[in-house]
């Protein structure tokens, strides 16, 4: 049997393969050269954002600013609604890439609608958070950091999620570039016995404080109220009427 050696034209030694791509790369634990997730980040619409979610005696209140930016430097839109209904008793607020957010919302809403069609009832908020987490973890990479809020038979729920698929429940939370400023206000002013009206004032104060210091947040606020009766979202360009 012919045994190729280094001098044979049939030999496949390492020297001859130096310029040939390795079909087995990248290996587990290695990354492609460069951070491709950041490619073109300066031209991608982002909701730099301050978003907050609070549980109340009456349900859940979610709030977000209205600004979208390009690369965190240029304001590309001053009237973005960052809270979207997923089902009549649940909503999702988004910080991060606008395109990723829109795609993720469509996917989660489709799954919720499919569940309702099959079961004849809305998905529980805990199950909805698990579905959202699974989509983030197992689907395409979404550069988004959402807050999920909703009301079911067990009361009001607020969940923080991240692009890696984690899901954490809390009585209040904040996300986005303005999170440090908003959380400071929530830590001082939140209490578990808040009414919806009280929570509206606290959330407005949190978003306003973030908007004053975070260049990627501002241009007004959307307030979303979720109760057993349904979901409503109202936009305000000024904070004075809410404080």
From Swiss-Prot:
Entries under Gene3D superfamilies matching the protein? Glutamine Phosphoribosylpyrophosphate, subunit 1, domain 1
One GO MF term attached to the UniProt entry: endopeptidase activity
Mind telling me which residues form the propeptide?
A: 1-48
Q: What is its EC number?
A: 3.4.25.1
Cellular component, GO annotation: cytosol; proteasome core complex, beta-subunit complex
Keyword Nucleotide-binding in record: no
Residue ranges spanning the membrane: these are none
Region Disordered, residue ranges: 1-46
Report which reactions are catalysed by this protein: Cleavage of peptide bonds with very broad specificity
Q: Which residues form the active site?
A: 49 (nucleophile)
Record key words, sorted? Autocatalytic cleavage, Cytoplasm, Hydrolase, Protease, Proteasome, Threonine protease, Zymogen
Q: What does this protein do?
A: Component of the proteasome core, a large protease complex with broad specificity involved in protein degradation.
User: What interactions and quaternary structure are annotated?
Assistant: The 20S proteasome core is composed of 14 alpha and 14 beta subunits that assemble into four stacked heptameric rings, resulting in a barrel-shaped structure. The two inner rings, each composed of seven catalytic beta subunits, are sandwiched by two outer rings, each composed of seven alpha subunits. The catalytic chamber with the active sites is on the inside of the barrel. Has a gated structure, the ends of the cylinder being occluded by the N-termini of the alpha-subunits. Is capped at one or both ends by the proteasome regulatory ATPase, PAN.
UniProt record similarity statement: Belongs to the peptidase T1B family.
Q: What is this protein called?
A: Proteasome subunit beta
Q: Which organism is it from?
A: Halobacterium salinarum (strain ATCC 700922 / JCM 11081 / NRC-1) (Halobacterium halobium)
């Amino acid at each position: 049997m012919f045994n190729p050696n280094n001098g044979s034209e049939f030999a496949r030694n390492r020297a001859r393969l130096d310029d040939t791509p390795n079909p087995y790369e990248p290996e587990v634990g290695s990354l492609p050269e460069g951070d491709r997730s950041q490619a073109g980040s300066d031209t991608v619409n982002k909701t730099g954002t301050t978003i907050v979610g609070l549980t109340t005696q009456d349900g859940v209140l979610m709030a977000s600013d209205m600004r979208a930016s390009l690369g965190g430097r240029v304001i590309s839109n001053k009237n973005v609604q960052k809270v979207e209904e997923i089902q009549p008793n649940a909503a999702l607020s988004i910080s991060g890439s606008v395109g990723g957010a829109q795609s993720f919302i469509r996917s989660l809403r489709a799954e919720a609608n499919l569940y309702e069609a099959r079961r004849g009832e809305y998905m529980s908020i805990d199950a909805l958070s698990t579905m959202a987490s699974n989509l983030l973890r197992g689907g395409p990479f979404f550069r988004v950091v959402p807050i999920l809020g909703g009301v079911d038979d067990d009361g009001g729920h607020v969940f923080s999620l991240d692009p890696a698929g984690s899901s954490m429940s809390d009585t209040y939370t904040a996300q986005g570039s303005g999170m440090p400023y908003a959380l400071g206000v929530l830590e001082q002013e939140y209490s578990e016995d808040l009414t919806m009206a009280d929570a509206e004032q606290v959330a407005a104060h949190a978003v306003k404080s973030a908007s004053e210091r975070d260049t990627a947040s501002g241009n007004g606020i959307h307030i979303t109220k979720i109760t057993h009766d349904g979901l409503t979202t109202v936009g305000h360009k000024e904070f004075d009427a809410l404080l």
